[in-house]
């Protein structure tokens, strides 16, 4: 290579190299800015969903403070307990059910619960709004003794409790429960009122995808790293089940 070509090559390298470096730095800066923007958006979405979930459960835990004072629960349990002993198909039980059912079911509609339970002091499920297979079972010695509902009943003897999502056979889906103790006029524990949190309500919060595009989604994960809501994009592969 003669000296002219060598000089031309050198000049080209000297001229192109700064442009290449400048282009790389600009691209790197742009990529970093886009990444930072994406992470900031994700952080904002996380905080919004966190607040929505906290408000959802907070309002329901607040509602639980009034349940022991609500006569339809303590009074309902005191009515259902002796009728239950006569049998679910007995005239006594059906009469109480006809009188009390609608007043208890309304809590499903107003607060979005899946089910409402009245449980006597011995752990018998004497009433449910949904009338699934858990109605009539005993939460101490029966097939649901290790279920979330049974744990909620046991823990509620000392106060209002929340039991995390786990598979619940009678509903054929994952369920969590909130329960609170019920007492008679003398202040003696007579059983519990329990409420099954609807998975649909949690999914409705987490699967609202405004501003996420076609591939964005949020879902709830518990401390055990298991799903607490279903994936919107892949509900079969990634779900609470």
Placement of each model-derived feature along the sequence:
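Juxtamembrane extracytoplasmic/periplasmic/luminal helical "stalk" adjacent to the first N-terminal
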Residues: 5-93, 105-116, 121, 162, ...
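Short, conserved clusters of charged catalytic residues that mark active-site
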Residues: 8, 48, 59, 98-102, ...
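Conserved catalytic core of Hanks-type protein kinase domains
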Residues: 67, 155, 221
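Intrinsic low-complexity, intrinsically disordered coil/linker regions enriched in small/polar
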Residues: 83-86, 128-144, 158, 184-186, ...
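Short, flexible loop segments at the rims of nucleotide/cofactor-binding pockets, characterized by
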Residues: 93-95, 141-142
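Extracytoplasmic/periplasmic ligand-binding sensor regions of membrane-associated signaling proteins
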Residues: 101-196
């Amino acid at each position: 290579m003669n000296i002219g070509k060598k000089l031309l090559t050198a000049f080209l390298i000297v001229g192109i190299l700064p442009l290449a470096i400048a282009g790389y730095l600009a691209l790197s800066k742009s990529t970093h800015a886009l990444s930072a923007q994406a992470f900031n958006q994700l952080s904002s979405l996380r905080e919004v969903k966190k607040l929505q979930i906290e408000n959802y459960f907070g309002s329901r835990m607040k509602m639980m403070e009034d349940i022991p004072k609500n006569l339809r629960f303590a009074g309902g349990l005191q009515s259902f307990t002796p009728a239950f002993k006569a049998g679910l198909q007995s005239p006594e039980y059906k009469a109480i059910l006809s009188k009390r059912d609608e007043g208890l079911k309304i809590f499903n509609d107003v607060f979005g619960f899946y089910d409402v339970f009245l449980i006597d002091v011995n752990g018998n499920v004497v009433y449910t709004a949904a009338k699934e297979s858990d109605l009539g079972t005993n939460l101490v010695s029966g097939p649901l003794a290790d279920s979330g509902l049974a744990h909620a009943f046991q823990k509620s003897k000392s106060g209002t409790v929340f039991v995390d999502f786990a598979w619940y056979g009678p509903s054929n889906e994952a369920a969590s429960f909130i329960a609170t103790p019920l007492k008679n006029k003398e202040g003696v524990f007579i059983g519990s009122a329990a409420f099954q949190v609807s998975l649909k309500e949690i999914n409705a919060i987490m699967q609202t995808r405004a501003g996420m595009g076609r591939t964005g989604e949020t879902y709830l994960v518990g401390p055990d790293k298991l799903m607490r809501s279903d994936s919107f994009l892949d509900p079969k592969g990634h779900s609470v089940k």
